[in-house]
Amino acid sequence: MMFHVKPQGGNGVPDALRAKLDRFAEILTRWNSRINLVSPRDLAHLWDRHIADCLQLASLIPPGVRLADMGSGGGFPGLIIAMATDADVTLIESDQRKAAFLREAARAVGARVTIIARRIEDADIPPVQVVTARALAALPQLLEWSSHFLAPDGFCLFLKGRNVEDELTAAAADWHMAVSRLPSRTNADGTILRLGDIRRVRHSERAPGR
């Protein structure tokens, strides 16, 4: 079945990138009948709910950086970023079947990626300037995982939903960070978090009772 990326939300996507996204969507649709990469009801809305959502991050990523995407699953957002930028992307995915999908999709679209088929906490990779994740875990856990390989001058980009402020409050108990909030262009309840200057709260800085 030939799958064409839908044009809505896709204005400004170069033809070469659109062709790669079409090929990626074809492969994802085929694999989704065997393993759960996205909800079956989302297949007809891959552009709006998944691809365009992840493409928002491309303009926020500096040229040529090393980037780690945690819990890459169906390729969101890491493989989309690899197609849309020149970042050196590492995809971390512990599910072996999903990692196999990522390998096939990356080869088919010519994406520059390294795939680590291990748990995030067991991934042994050099420091990266950017860490990304989408629909993976609450912010405190994302920051804990990121701390293993985020460079001191690096930052995180996380796609978050309506509970973002609660997650930021919870994370502030253990982490100092400079927070930038960018409204999602594809999800009315969504927020892109850019977190920099991240460091763990020292015991002496904790509020009484924590």
From Swiss-Prot:
One family name in Pfam for this protein: GidB
A GO molecular-function annotation: rRNA (guanine-N7-)-methyltransferase activity
Function, as annotated: Specifically methylates the N7 position of guanine in position 527 of 16S rRNA.
E.C. number: 2.1.1.170
Localization per Swiss-Prot or TrEMBL: Cytoplasm
InterPro entries hit by this protein: rRNA_ssu_MeTfrase_G, SAM-dependent_MTases_sf
Coiled-coil ranges from the UniProt annotation: none
NCBIfam families, alphabetized: rsmG_gidB
HAMAP family found in the cross-reference section: 16SrRNA_methyltr_G (MF_00074)
Main location: cytoplasm
Top-rank lineage group of the source organism: Bacteria
Alphabetical list of PANTHER family matching this protein: S-ADENOSYL-L-METHIONINE-DEPENDENT METHYLTRANSFERASES SUPERFAMILY PROTEIN
Keyword terms: Cytoplasm, Methyltransferase, rRNA processing, S-adenosyl-L-methionine, Transferase
Family the UniProt entry places it in: Belongs to the methyltransferase superfamily. RNA methyltransferase RsmG family.
Reactions catalysed according to its record: guanosine(527) in 16S rRNA + S-adenosyl-L-methionine = N(7)-methylguanosine(527) in 16S rRNA + S-adenosyl-L-homocysteine
Entry keyword annotation includes Cytoplasm: yes
List of residues binding S-adenosyl-L-methionine: 71, 76, 120-121, 134
GO CC annotation, single: cytosol
Protein name: Ribosomal RNA small subunit methyltransferase G
